[in-house]
Amino acid sequence: IVGGFTIGIDTVPY
């Protein structure tokens, strides 16, 4: 993921 949150799994693909 680029420029987002990664909590265990990619969340909010910002």
From Swiss-Prot:
Predominant place of localization: secreted
EC number of this enzyme: 3.4.21.-
Enzyme category, top tier: hydrolase
Subcellular location: Secreted, Extracellular space
Any one GO molecular function term: serine-type peptidase activity
Alphabetized UniProt keyword annotations: Hydrolase, Protease, Secreted, Serine protease
Biological processes per GO annotation: proteolysis
Any one of the GO CC terms: extracellular region
Source superkingdom: Eukaryota
Functional description taken from the UniProt entry: Protease that shows preferential cleavage after Arg and Lys residues.
Name of the protein this chain belongs to: Cocoonase
